Design a protein with these regions (language model features):
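Bacterial N-terminal signal peptides that target proteins for export
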Residues: 1-9
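N-terminal signal peptide c-region/cleavage motif recognized by signal peptidases
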Residues: 16-17
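Domain-level marker for long, solvent-exposed, non-transmembrane regions
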Residues: 21-263
Length: 263
């Protein structure tokens, strides 16, 4: 019963986040925790009880902390199962592959404890945050056939990133696709270099254009485009498509921030 109540608290406590955070960050809440698509972190809370046979109070607390951390990391994997990867693949499907699951579990060593609560009965509640950046996102993305990027016409762009404003309902995913009117892909997993994918995935999300332009991923001089939601893809009109085709370097570096529509 205690663990069940605490798993609810792990999500409910996030609702009370500061107003500025809630207004700017795109957060997906799940049964076991949350995904901050702006910071690209997964947050979950775990609980640990002290062993009955501990030799002293200090040993009991250390073991309770270890158990709470292990429980929280297990919940991180459950959160990842609820993450959308691309149009046809979800986190649960990717993590059903043993190799992918073991690699993801190995990345959980990079999780950091954010808060710990020590209860009167010796139990510990611990909240951990695990970065999707630095490899975890790359592990979750499906295998991709090698593609040679198309040459970019015209002089190099002075823009440092692309801010994509979405019109219409759209949910975050690790590998969004932006297509033109003919269905040709303008941006997606194949557009981003492997080093950039390992560094920080393919995209970040925010809830306002101002925060997207201030995001480190956008750089100092991003260009903005508007697209519309088209089911599992984002549709760029002729003007937006032309801009995207001219931003080859920014796209290859994954310097894309998507502004989600207001709920």
């Amino acid at each position: 019963m205690r663990a069940g109540l605490r798993s609810v608290c792990a999500v409910a406590c996030l609702v009370g986040a500061p107003a500025a955070y809630a207004e700017e960050h795109a957060v997906q809440r799940t049964e076991h925790g949350s995904v901050d698509w702006t910071e690209l972190t997964v947050v979950a809370e775990g609980s640990g009880l002290p062993p009955e046979d501990a030799i002293d109070r200090s040993a009991a607390r250390l073991e309770a902390e270890r158990r709470a951390e292990d429980d929280a990391k297990a919940r991180v994997l459950e959160v990842l199962k609820a993450v959308a990867i691309d149009a046809g693949v979800g986190g649960a499907e990717r993590l059903s592959n043993e190799r992918v699951r073991l690699q993801a579990e190995g990345m959980l060593r990079r999780c950091e404890a954010r808060t710990s609560r020590f209860l009167s009965d010796g139990a510990v509640d611990m909240t951990v945050a695990c970065p999707l950046e630095g490899g975890l996102a790359a592990i979750l993305l499906p295998p991709l056939e090698t593609r040679t990027p198309e040459p970019v016409d015209g002089p190099p762009s002075e823009h440092t990133g692309v801010v994509v404003v979405v019109e219409g309902e759209y949910a975050p995913r690790l590998a969004p696709r932006i297509v033109d009117d003919s269905g040709r892909e303008l941006y997606g997993q194949a557009s981003v270099g492997s080093n950039a994918v390992r560094r920080w995935g393919t995209v970040a999300y925010t809830k306002s254009e101002a925060s997207a332009r201030a995001h480190p991923r956008s750089g100092d001089a991003p260009v903005g485009v508007s697209v519309s939601s088209a089911g599992n893809a984002l549709l760029a009109g002729p003007e937006a498509a032309q801009v995207l085709r001219s931003e080859g370097m920014a796209l290859r570096e994954g310097r894309v921030v998507i502004v989600l529509p207001a709920p």
